[in-house]
Structures are given as C-alpha cells and as structure tokens.
Amino acid sequence: MSKTTIIGIAGGSGSGKTSVTSKILKNLEGYSVALIEQDYYYKNQDHLTFEERLKTNYDHPFAFDNELLIQNLKDLRNGKTVEVPTYDYSNHTRSEKTITFEPKDVIIVEGIFALENSNLRDLMDVKIYVDTDADLRILRRIVRDIEERGRTMESVIDQYLTVVRPMHNQFIEPTKKYADIIIPEGGSNSVAIDIMTTKIQSLIQV
C-alpha cells in the first residue's frame, strides 16, 4: 500500500465540518478511507469524581489526548491496526468500548482542534479549516446538543456564551492560519470541496 494520506479538517463547533467531511468521503468512494473524529480522544477522567467531571471544559485543547491520537495515526501510517477510544458523554469519561481501525489510503481527522497541535499538524498532508458565521454555528450547536445530547436550550446558550465562544476566539479561530485551504460556509461550498477532493486524489496516486 502507498503512503497513507492524512487530512485534517478543523473549524468551530457547528461550522459544518461534518458536512464537508461527508461530501469529501462521498467524492472518494472507491478509495479506502477512514474517518477518525478528534472527539474520540477526550481524555480519560476515571480518576475524577462525577461532580469534578461535570466541570470539564470540552472546548479547551487540554481536554484532548493528542499524544494517543498522534501515536494512532503513526501506527496506521506504518501499516498497523489500532484500537481507537470512544467517549461516554453521559458519564463524562472514556468508554470501555473501542473502535478498530485498519490502515487505509486516506485518513481524515475531524475536530475543532484538528489544527491546534503542531505535532498533529506535522502528520497532515492537507489541512482544511471550515469557516462559518458565528450566528449559524450557535444555531447548529443548539439543535445538536438538544437533540443528540439531551441538553436544554438555556444550558446550551449559557455554555456558548461563557465557554464555547471565548474558547473559539482564543484557540480555534487562530488555527485558521495553518490551513492549506479555508472553506467558507461549510458543506454548501461545492467548489472548494471538489478542489480538495482533486488534491487528495492526486496525493493518493503519488
């Protein structure tokens, strides 16, 4: 197998990263592709009480176990199968369940801090930042957290104003400068997605 191509897709919460990723995956049908979500790598918090876990700031870079993510990517690139962790949001700690990933032609790493860590960026062949208006991002986050995570609207808005927005401005927005391409308006930008697909295909064939 040729060298594994690693793609990083970053952007704020609700920016449309998942939509962009889904369309790139669809365009790459016929290739062997794996999607690894950075959210899988929230740190294990078994050593903390449940009350302490409730205070976790999931929008801070320190919440992620990037060392494990980097090691998993290196192993996959070297042809090894890896066990990727998963996260239990109800208990605010790592789940006992893992997901088995085998080496692929392309690995997509998607997450709000996908471009924040320099050692992680160094593994990437293509770095993408999805840039979407803040008003649209908060609306998407409200819908997601209420429907998928059982949150109330009040709690989501409070978290956005006190944590998500400040963390975005401090840590996520600045990573835009590391991107090879910035995709405005997420998955609706078919031109940018097609350009990125063509670039990825060219890397696979090298």
Curated annotation (Swiss-Prot):
Binding site for ATP: G11, G12, S13, G14, S15, G16, K17, T18
SUPFAM superfamilies in alphabetical order: P-loop containing nucleoside triphosphate hydrolases (SSF52540)
EC number: 2.7.1.48
Keyword Metal-binding: no
Origin superkingdom: Bacteria
EC top class named in words: transferase
Annotated localization: Cytoplasm
InterPro entries in the record: P-loop_NTPase (IPR027417), PRK/URK (IPR006083), Uridine_kinase (IPR026008), Uridine_kinase-like (IPR000764)
Family annotation (Pfam families): PRK
Pathway where this protein functions: Pyrimidine metabolism; CTP biosynthesis via salvage pathway; CTP from cytidine: step 1/3; Pyrimidine metabolism; UMP biosynthesis via salvage pathway; UMP from uridine: step 1/1
An MF annotation (GO) of this entry: uridine kinase activity
Sorted UniProt keywords: ATP-binding, Cytoplasm, Kinase, Nucleotide-binding, Transferase
Catalytic activity reported: uridine + ATP = UMP + ADP + H(+); cytidine + ATP = CMP + ADP + H(+)
GO biological process: CTP salvage; UMP salvage
Entry GO terms, CC: cytoplasm
HAMAP family: Uridine_kinase
Family, as annotated: Belongs to the uridine kinase family.
Protein name per UniProt: Uridine kinase
Lineage of origin: Bacteria, Bacillati, Bacillota, Bacilli, Bacillales
Gene designation per UniProt: udk
